[in-house]
Amino acid sequence: MTTLVPASLFLLLWTLPGKVLLSVALAKEDVKSGLKGSQPMSPSDFLDKLMGRTSGYDARIRPNFKGPPVNVTCNIFINSFGSVTETTMDYRVNVFLRQQWNDPRLAYREYPDDSLDLDPSMLDSIWKPDLFFANEKGANFHEVTTDNKLLRIFKNGNVLYSIRLTLILSCPMDLKNFPMDIQTCTMQLESFGYTMNDLMFEWLEDAPAVQVAEGLTLPQFILRDEKDLGYCTKHYNTGKFTCIEVKFHLERQMGYYLIQMYIPSLLIVILSWVSFWINMDAAPARVGLGITTVLTMTTQSSGSRASLPKVSYVKAIDIWMAVCLLFVFAALLEYAAVNFVSRQHKEFMRLRRRQRRQRMEEDIIRESRFYFRGYGLGHCLQARDGGPMEGSSIYSPQPPTPLLKEGETMRKLYVDRAKRIDTISRAVFPFTFLVFNIFYWVVYKVLRSEDIHQAL
């Protein structure tokens, strides 16, 4: 009995260190495994699991495939509103285009962050809407210093895609009131391949869908605050496609056209009236002034049309230029009338001399029938009282009337008439032009402007 107790005690003491070491080793392994389980997944591993080859995500298939259409919410931030060109009827704009939609396949829980900002190169790995600008003439992306694109994925599967674009968009213009017009330019966002059964565009409702950079100014226009948002669904042979649009209202500023067109043409018309105060005998001065103003006005009118498209209707600037040209041409014709009237006395006196000469010839022929002195019969003629009639008394023409005095009177009469034309023109031309100006500006700046504002 005594020999068995020491043996068992010896066995216990021999195996105890091994058990302690084994317990410590197992405890270390448990601690390591616990720490490894609580450590978050690396971003690379997470992205590979979310949209990599092993994730089963296919960027060629839209979300909710064979289910309800994908709703894409759009909003635009305008960085700059470039030149509006009348000849080509387009405008240039630089924008941030933002699209947001939900892709349930990209929802996650494994990563602690609420959203992930991804590199633009990841755009090729996910599905994107096939948005294009229906009225686009030209566009380009921006790649300085890197691709101006943003991709953000949220925890619930929402995707935010933002891109910076410079666009040249078509803008059909109505130039009847040019340069006192208000143009409405549209921007249409449309799906290229997905019909409305697969994709729907809509404007952002929680915040302004179209924002403009603070302090944005245009050289010739004022961009009005009212921006009409709407839908422009397109129907083609291939189906019905979603489309949304925004309308920008651009009110033209007249400062440039007042300085370059209206005021110069106004001064040319006033300059043509100077000829009314120049002596009518100074024909070179008056004719030269008239022709110069006509040619200058013609050049001015041609210059105003050079920067505008060739349209079939009459514009406000065309009416102004045509009337100004008519006034300067009328001033030139006025001198032609004055010169013609002032020379009428010469024609009158020439006619009077011709008539007098004809009467004298008729009198000579009539009286010569009774003049027979050359035939020796003069002593046979008797007067009414019975006495003989001398041959010299048979024809005694009356003394000629003083034509010189009559000519001077007629010359003064017609010259006074010509001067009266100049005097009347000095009042009629400015008054008529003033009436035209009142009518012109009231119609285009008041009446038509109110009609345009009501239509908007």
UniProtKB/Swiss-Prot annotation:
Detected in the retina inner plexiform layer, especially at the border between layer three and four (at protein level). It is found in: Postsynaptic cell membrane; Synapse; Perikaryon; Cell projection, Dendrite. It holds the Pfam family Neur_chan_memb. It catalyses: chloride(in) = chloride(out). The keyword Transmembrane helix applies. GO terms for molecular function: extracellularly glycine-gated chloride channel activity; glycine binding; transmembrane signaling receptor activity; transmitter-gated monoatomic ion channel activity. PANTHER family: NEUROTRANSMITTER GATED ION CHANNEL. The alpha subunit binds strychnine. This is Glycine receptor subunit alpha-4. It comes from Mus musculus.
